[in-house]
Each structure stands twice: as C-alpha cells, then as structure tokens.
Amino acid sequence: MTAWPTINMAATGQNITRLMKQYGMTVRDVQSAFGFSNPQAVYKWKRGQSMPTIDNLVILASMFGVKIDDIIVVEATDVASLIA
C-alpha cells in the first residue's frame, strides 16, 4: 500500500502552543505580530482546527527560531483507507 504524508493538525497545534509557552508569547502577542484584527486564527491554530498558511508558518518559524518541520507534524496515511 502507498502511504501519503498528511499533517496532523492537532499535534501541530500542540507544537505551536508549546513554542508560544516556551518563548513566553501570548495569543495576543502572536495576533499583534501578524497584524490580525482578532485572535481567532491563532486560537484555531492552537486547537488544531486550522493551519497557518505557508507564509505564516515561515513567520512562526522565524519568530521561534526553529524550522517549519519543528512546527508541523507529518504522518503517513494509507492511501487505500482514503479511497475505501
């Protein structure tokens, strides 16, 4: 069976939460850094309900001094299970 990589959004959100805590950043700090008018996007990232765009992942990685691969969690998904 072929396995395709997929992003585990919940685990990625946990990484974002961990990095924010590690660097002493609040949701409001991240919201302000991105210039968002409200914090909902950041809360959704943390809960794994949505993913930052590629551009925003690059910014997050730069803010935290890590690689994008240190933020996103990629897992293999069995292709057969996707089309069954």
Functional labels for PLM-detected ranges:
Residues 1-25, 33:
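A short, Lys/Arg-rich alpha-helix, primarily the initiator
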Residues 17, 28, 58:
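Residues within the helices of the helix-turn-helix
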Residues 45-46, 56, 75:
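DNA major-groove recognition helix of helix-turn-helix
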Residues 55-70:
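DNA major-groove recognition helix of helix-turn-helix/homeodomain DNA-binding modules
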Residues 70-84:
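Short amphipathic recognition helices of helix-turn-helix/homeodomain-type DNA-binding modules
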